[in-house]
Structures are given as C-alpha cells and as structure tokens.
Amino acid sequence: MDYKTAGVNIALADSLINKISSKSDQIGKFAANFTLDKKLNRDLVASCDGVGTKILLALEAKRKYNRSLKSIGQDCVAMVINDILCENAEPLFFMDYLSTSKLNESDYLEIIQGIQDACEYVNIPLIGGETAELPGMFTEGSVDVCGFAVGTKHFLDFSKVELGDLVIGIHSTGVHSNGFSLVRKLLIEYPVCDEHMEQLLEPTQLYHNHIKMLRSNFVDIKAIAHITGGGFSNINRVLSKLVTIQYYDADPFYEHEEIFKWIQNKSQLSNIEMQNTFNCGIGMMVVIPATRLKDIPFSDYSVLGKIIPCS
C-alpha cells in the first residue's frame, strides 16, 4: 500500500502547484517572504499549515484511553514554526484556526493548551485565532486544526551552499505530522497496542532552540529544510539544481527504527518510497560547512552526507 492508495496523491499536488506557480514567485518555499521596508532591509515571513489526519488518530486515542489532545496543539505550532525557520526567520507571533461539527469543551481546551505551551516554548505569543462550528461539513466528533505565524528575517542571509558542505539531520521525535493517511489505513488491518499508538502520536519536535543554539555557536547555516510531506526530497526545495546530496548511509532509518520498519513492513514500501513519504527519524536538515561540524552544541543529529555536483 502506498500513499496514493491511502488517498494522498503527492504527484498530483506537485502538478497543481506547478500550474499555479506563475501566480506567485513564493510558491514552493517553506514560507512566504514579504518586504516590509526595502530601505531598512526588513522582511517578514509568513506560514500556514495544519496537523492533517493525525488528528483523527489522536481523537480515537482520547476516546479509547483518555489520552490528552495537547500534543496536537504542539503539532500545529511545530508544523508552522519549523517552516518559518527554513526561511532564515525568527517567529513573532502565532494564530490558530479550529473547526469542528460541534464544539467539545474538553477537546477544545486541551488543543488550545497544547498550542499555548508550544508558543511559550519558542517564546512567542498566541495572539488570537478563529473557532468555527460547521455542522454538516464534518462527521460528528471530528476536528481540524491549523495555524498561522509571522516572523521577521534575520539581517544576515544564509551563506551560499558550496560543494563539500555537510548535511546534518536533526532527529525527529517520531512520525511527526505527515503520512497519517497511510498509517491510519494500515491500522485498520493491523491494529497496534497502546504503547505503539503512543509512539505514533508523539508530538512534532519544535526545532527553534536547535537553530538558535547553532546561531549562538556561530555555526554558519547555509540552508534549512523541514522534513514533512515529501520526506527527504524536501531538501531539494532549498538547494540549487546544480547540486545534490551524496548520502553516507544506505539504511533509510536514523531514529525510531521500530515504528518506521513496522510501517514499511505492513505497507511494503521501498526504502526510497519510505524516505519520500516519512521523515524516517530526521525532522530537519541543515547544510553547514564541514569545518563547523565540531561546533554543533547538541547531540541529537546525524551527519547525512555532503553536497556534490549533479551528474
């Protein structure tokens, strides 16, 4: 079973994006840039994203064994803020959008608390949002959660990516927030225990502090890619078409091997298909000079490979 069989057609989505790309030169980026003041070189960066069908699994876990939905709030914030980091920006504030057929007080308060906690973690305010009851548009008990954020660009641009630069992968906390349309299809046929369900629902890592630590240690960041839908191929969105990555390890899994191997075994996806669908243990890729590897101030990363010319 592949992602398309599960109901998600990435190739079609890419094709549609190409068709509308003439409408804006911002399409295809992790977040959109807006020049606020050309003279002062002040740019804003904005992003919008959601948690996707992971919410359905989280709702099921709450109904089954009273698992809190706070983690979904963190997922929402992380999906947006991690994208803003890829555009060399510092987040300023966050807004949420929650829609449902009928409001459930417990669900609502838990999700909002998770959003607030995640905003506090990255030191930004939750300044508002929208809550919509939409009877007839959702099945009973369903919820959709999206987020919006604005950041300000750092004054110093990323340095140019060069041949020989290293690509490091900062580890994920698990599956994060993509691939769940496929995961949910698998769970219908192959139910898992509560422990494995908890692993699947582990909230998306917020990488704000990792990037902040790299900057504080004067590590020259050349490019950042958030590994979500599209998996490892997302790094191509921030690289020139003249270069590519030579990966050091043929093994597709870097962390959380048990849960990703379970997905692969049950879905029969190839290694390449897995890396183009799931994060496989890497939630964010960062390109740095090889000489600065020793200056990375945290340990939860792997050296994935180096930048080489396209053949």
Language-model features: locations:
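Glycine-rich phosphate/pyrophosphate-binding loop regions near the starts of catalytic domains
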Residues: 20-173
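Active-site loop/lid in soluble adenylation, ligation, and acyl-transfer enzymes
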Residues: 13
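Short secondary-structure boundary/capping elements
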Residues: 72-79, 203-206, 255
